[in-house]
Amino acid sequence: VLSIAEVRDAALARVERPEQAEKFVAELGWHDYWRRVQAALGDRIRTAIEPPARDWRQASRLEHVPADVLEARTGMACVDAFVTTLHATGWLHNHERMWLASWLVHVRGVHWLAGADWFLEHLLDGDPAANHLSWQWVAGTFAAKPYLFNRENLETFTSGRHCRPCPLLGRCDVEGSYEALDARIFVAGGPARPPLRLRPAADWAAPTGNGPSRRPLVWLTLDSAAAGSPALAAHPLAPRLFVIDPRWLAAERPTLKRLVFLVECLADVPGVEIVVGDPATTVPAWAAARGCDSVAVADSPCPAVRAAAAAIGTRLPLTVVAWPAFCDASRVDDLGRFSRYWQRVSRSALRPTVPTAGG
């Protein structure tokens, strides 16, 4: 498991000029952007950040994913293939994620949160920031316009493998031009919405507690459950602990495949101990039992991690260790749109963390 900066560095090492990797690095930029938005909003990413950019003709929203979708028997060859792949492997290509989300929200009338929660149960790389905010982007509740696709778009990017054998070819839900789809799905025009301005959160990477640290405990969290955690890099000889929070299990309902993937990631961390409990109390108790006098944790935008860290910090000195920087975000003052963020950081994001040989 690699950090965003490490993936960027690997991509830049494979090209002669940084500009040749710009499109891929921009995709990584979305992940950095989503994390910054989650850090600013916390659990509010589970509610609409803006009113929908367009009003649906089908005004009511389903609060669940329909059974025919979950059972991959919609009759849409592409949709049924995407659902089958998601359930069987815990992974979908980014295009497939967007197509499936768009069809569910705009054609079937499923509330984006129901779809986002369903994805999060299954995706091995499930990340609430990227997942839920991407669904909001598709729905138009965190975007200038909703995301639509048509059969021509899908056929182009899949070489027709879904469309040619589909029994609904020529009469499917996404048949027609974008203008025709727009007219079928949305009310003409759009609601007036004030410009969205979203200030970044203050840097969380700051120490808490008092006194010197001689024997820290490294607390691994869901987004740092790997040997590459910066907290482990800062304290390579320290005891390390991962706590499975029953509240997380109840909230996200991860599938067995997702849990196995998590354990496989942790298996790469020598000496890690895995326990079940409330991190706010389990981490200090475990630290005391092992003779540790402080806690180190990797930076995380997750509100549950931050709340637990605040509680731990009242009992032990706690240090937040930053990840390798993907970009210089010091000039970012508005996260309301990705384009504003990317305009501020794109040049720095195209520079490697460690210059390549001869660079």
Predicted regions and their residues:
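Trp/Phe/Arg-rich N-terminal binding region typifying the photolyase-homology
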Residues: 1-26, 30, 40-53, 84-88, ...
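Active-site-proximal binding-pocket segments
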Residues: 2-10, 17-201
